[in-house]
Amino acid sequence: MKAKLLVLLCALSATDADTICIGYHANNSTDTVDTVLEKNVTVTHSVNLLEDSHNGKLCRLKGIAPLQLGKCNIAGWILGNPECESLFSKKSWSYIAETPNSENGTCYPGYFADYEELREQLSSVSSFERFEIFPKERSWPKHNVTRGVTASCSHKGKSSFYRNLLWLTEKNGSYPNLSKSYVNNKEKEVLVLWGVHHPSNIEDQKTIYRKENAYVSVVSSNYNRRFTPEIAERPKVRGQAGRINYYWTLLEPGDTIIFEANGNLIAPWHAFALNRGFGSGIITSNASMDECDTKCQTPQGAINSSLPFQNIHPVTIGECPKYVRSTKLRMVTGLRNIPSIQSRGLFGAIAGFIEGGWTGMIDGWYGYHHQNEQGSGYAADQKSTQNAINGITNKVNSVIEKMNTQFTAVGKEFNKLEKRMENLNKKVDDGFLDIWTYNAELLVLLENERTLDFHDSNVKNLYEKVKSQLKNNAKEIGNGCFEFYHKCNNECMESVKNGTYDYPKYSEESKLNREKIDGVKLESMGVYQILAIYSTVASSLVLLVSLGAISFWMCSNGSLQCRICI
């Protein structure tokens, strides 16, 4: 009995088999991604697809400075408000920046017809030529062109008027009928602006135009309108009870525009030959101008990013990422990051891909850890790692390329009377934005799930590759590890890793060692059977002796009567 127990203990203590484990890389990364099934999965490597930073400045777009309107708005700039004089020399720009609460617009109160449409037209203009459509000194010889000034458009403390319009008044006690035409020979669209004055009383009408009833007619191929002044008392705005309504039209190349009036005409002085630039736009921003360059400008600031998505602002100008409402869009490129505690088991095995990854393997994503008499070490499987890197890199680049449709997205213009239309447009835009956000998030979730499954599959394939080579020359001991039935030196280990393991060479040694181990198992089973029988017999004898002693004691003190019948 003692000899058999000694054999078992010696067999267990002498076992120090060579092992090889399959596992994957782990590191100290704290990157987390979401998948379809899980949230906040820690991974070894990932790429961010969502830009959330900007510089807070207005920058040059592709080397061209923007037109910063400062204290002026579009109306003040294009009409020629004298307080916007510094802007008149600007001929080209990358985009137009307007502040939310600009002070200088229409200095003389009145209605600006189709103002939102004009803004929309100017948002696609990148430069223009400002020219005299009707020169001031020689176009109106029978009308006064200097007395049409007002305190509401004062400049440097003096009454003045718009720099692109002329207020024609009576001259020498009369206001003759006028007729003036312009033929567009600029070979591009020309923006023409004019106004109609509406006095507050008949006395002003007679004083300025020398007649009670007047009209203004403007005609071109695409425009035909006749205006009649509306004389009425009105509340004073900027000290004025009168009003000027402002109008505009786009004159096509070769077209003619004709002005006829017998009073109340605010005549064009300067017009604009427009050059369209579809990368331009108008943004409303409080950001300050800086000496910087960008490819994408938002009202919040410039974005310099090649990422496909951004969550900074929906209004963008230039080559910009698509705006989404997401707060996180991170795509996994590496593996699940679950570093294992590398503790030695009974046979010195390192925890494999089941418990977690290896921080000791730094030169690849998947690989091996071996242990034999010559030592132990990690080695990456370069082929499977490189194939995985190539596949995932191509996938990430493809996703970015497909989703990275960079473009300008400017806000639409609506006047105060079009509130219902603006609300409807906002709902439509919100719907499209929700769809874009959903599509972007779903794409990332699905691709993350596929990538992690792809890595799991690669580790499993590597495991099956080793298993198919070793066959019954080794046994699976869990944790992604195999224990050899034969001695496997470094050359042998290398052959397993590169797929050239010689199974027949080691099969005889493995067979003998398997039989020895199986014999030890049989011997140990015999020992366990003897111990079980001995334990059963001994327990039965103890039980019988105990029952006999109790019975004798009870009979001796009368507690139990014993009768023997013959």
From Swiss-Prot:
Keywords: Clathrin- and caveolin-independent endocytosis of virus by host, Clathrin-mediated endocytosis of virus by host, Disulfide bond, Fusion of virus membrane with host endosomal membrane, Fusion of virus membrane with host membrane, Glycoprotein, Hemagglutinin, Host cell membrane, Host membrane, Host-virus interaction, Lipoprotein, Membrane, Palmitate, Signal, Transmembrane, Transmembrane helix, Viral attachment to host cell, Viral envelope protein, Viral penetration into host cytoplasm, Virion, Virus endocytosis by host, Virus entry into host cell. Palmitoylated. In natural infection, inactive HA is matured into HA1 and HA2 outside the cell by one or more trypsin-like, arginine-specific endoprotease secreted by the bronchial epithelial cells. One identified protease that may be involved in this process is secreted in lungs by club cells. GO terms for biological process: clathrin-dependent endocytosis of virus by host cell; fusion of virus membrane with host endosome membrane; fusion of virus membrane with host plasma membrane; viral budding from plasma membrane; virion attachment to host cell. Residues 18-529 are extracellular. One of its GO terms (cellular component) is virion membrane. It is found in: Virion membrane; Host apical cell membrane. Coiled coil: none annotated. The keyword Amino-acid biosynthesis does not apply. Glycans are attached at residues 27-28, 40, 104, 144, 172, 177, 286, 304, 498. The chain crosses the membrane at residues 530-550. Disulfide bonds join 21-481, 59-292, 72-84, 107-153, 296-320, 488-492. Residues 1-17 form the signal peptide. Residues 551-566 are cytoplasmic. Its main location: virion. The keyword Nucleotidyltransferase does not apply. It is a single-pass type I membrane protein. A lipid is attached at residues 555, 562, 565 (S-palmitoyl cysteine). GO terms for molecular function: host cell surface receptor binding. Pfam families: Hemagglutinin. InterPro entries: Capsid_hemagglutn, Hemagglutn_HA1_a/b_dom_sf, Hemagglutn_influenz_A, Hemagglutn_influenz_A/B. Belongs to the influenza viruses hemagglutinin family. Binds to sialic acid-containing receptors on the cell surface, bringing about the attachment of the virus particle to the cell. This attachment induces virion internalization of about two third of the virus particles through clathrin-dependent endocytosis and about one third through a clathrin- and caveolin-independent pathway. Plays a major role in the determination of host range restriction and virulence. Class I viral fusion protein. Binds to sialic acid-containing receptors on the cell surface, bringing about the attachment of the virus particle to the cell. This attachment induces virion internalization either through clathrin-dependent endocytosis or through clathrin- and caveolin-independent pathway. Plays a major role in the determination of host range restriction and virulence. Class I viral fusion protein. Responsible for penetration of the virus into the cell cytoplasm by mediating the fusion of the membrane of the endocytosed virus particle with the endosomal membrane. Homotrimer of disulfide-linked HA1-HA2. Interacts with human CACNA1C. HAMAP family: INFV_HEMA. This is Hemagglutinin. The gene is HA.
